[in-house]
């Protein structure tokens, strides 16, 4: 990796930390149930109108509110996509989606995955994009943040049974965090040249004298929350490599910052609410170390070029296949790691065209559970599961009952932690096996051999871990793949949220014990190393056999 690559990573992380720190303080106020200045009156009016109670909920009530909102959104979006030809803002007269594609798309956006088995500009109307997908981009992001709010309160409250009010949290997260920041980002994108209109597609004459139909639409408004909410679904098929979505190098840098902004701010907020900012910094250090190493590996692999092209005598000093020439290899490598470390899935380069090792790293980042910064909310509660596991392992080594932030971690919490951690690996490995065992699964593979298996493994990993990016060589728009991936997305999202909320319900009722000489410090470099080791160990033991059949075999062949 060149000095330019190091400078790019350092600049990105520096700007990220500067922006995330004040946002973290604002999020800490919301976690502590302190309204932001000037918002209390608005909140009272908004709750009185529908008659919603703002009293606190136990973990089951909180969970039911989150699940109820998401199930309602799933049903509304599903029927909206089926009948989009009856709805307004459809200047191209696009038909409704098939039932399997509508189901896949609805589940995808409700679960914050944004897997797309379709091309946006030829499949969805402006109304479906705006009133359907963009709305779910906000709600799915707010749902993930609300869950981590509840879990943080569980660690910091003592001898209580309630975790806050889900409706209050969802309202505050949406109105005072997601909407204002997304609005600022959208205005910046428009200023830089991103589209924002409701015009019919425009026929233009090219410099060669041919005619081309240019897609239009309300792009910038969807693009902003797509990145900020770590959603990732593109308005166009080319996603963020399309100049109408991502027109300049500056918008590209802002998009990467937006992906990591809230996950980073939540780490700062956790430290503030816990009363020990070192706890939040510990999580950031662990995430950042894994992130920097992964970026370095991808940059190194892509700068080496494609060995198969070199063997044919072609000039392939760097691997530019599938990459936008506006951004180049280093920026494309950084973006690939950012979008897969977080559960975003937006792309500016085709991951299917990366080298074997360059494509394996994004796949592995998804497989370990999207815990390196991760999705908004989901990344931090996923990492907290590994924190509990690391504390448990340390307790076994020193012969003490494991505890974290003064709360003892008992058998119930560890069973739920193990269940939550095992959900996505089970979906990935069994889903990939099912796809390879069936003709319907194998027929979607564009390439034979190890790379074809990598396409399958990447798709199931992306769906189960709610990322949404793809090795695009897989032809996934079929009833088999739409249903398989919809199942993986649904269980991968809510199959983790349910045990996380149960853990929160168990922890909030416990009393914190004062630290003693035998208490394991969870804020220093020793615990950072233990946490990183736990993440790597679980990832290695679970996925090395599958990776050996895919990208590793491709690299060695």
From Swiss-Prot:
Main location: membrane
GO MF terms, alphabetically ordered: P-type potassium transmembrane transporter activity; potassium ion binding
GO cellular component: plasma membrane
Bilayer disposition of the protein: Multi-pass membrane protein
Subcellular location: Cell inner membrane
Transmembrane segments annotated in the record for this chain: 5-25, 63-83, 132-152, 170-190, 253-273, 283-303, 329-349, 356-376, 379-399, 416-436, 484-504, 526-546
Keyword Disulfide bond: no
UniProt keyword list: Cell inner membrane, Cell membrane, Ion transport, Membrane, Potassium, Potassium transport, Transmembrane, Transmembrane helix, Transport
One Pfam assignment: KdpA
InterPro entries, per the entry: KdpA
Its biological purpose: Part of the high-affinity ATP-driven potassium transport (or Kdp) system, which catalyzes the hydrolysis of ATP coupled with the electrogenic transport of potassium into the cytoplasm. This subunit binds the periplasmic potassium ions and delivers the ions to the membrane domain of KdpB through an intramembrane tunnel.
Family of the protein in this entry: Belongs to the KdpA family.
Subunit architecture: The system is composed of three essential subunits: KdpA, KdpB and KdpC.
Name the UniProt record assigns to this protein: Potassium-transporting ATPase potassium-binding subunit
Species name: Escherichia coli O17:K52:H18 (strain UMN026 / ExPEC)
Gene expressing this chain: kdpA
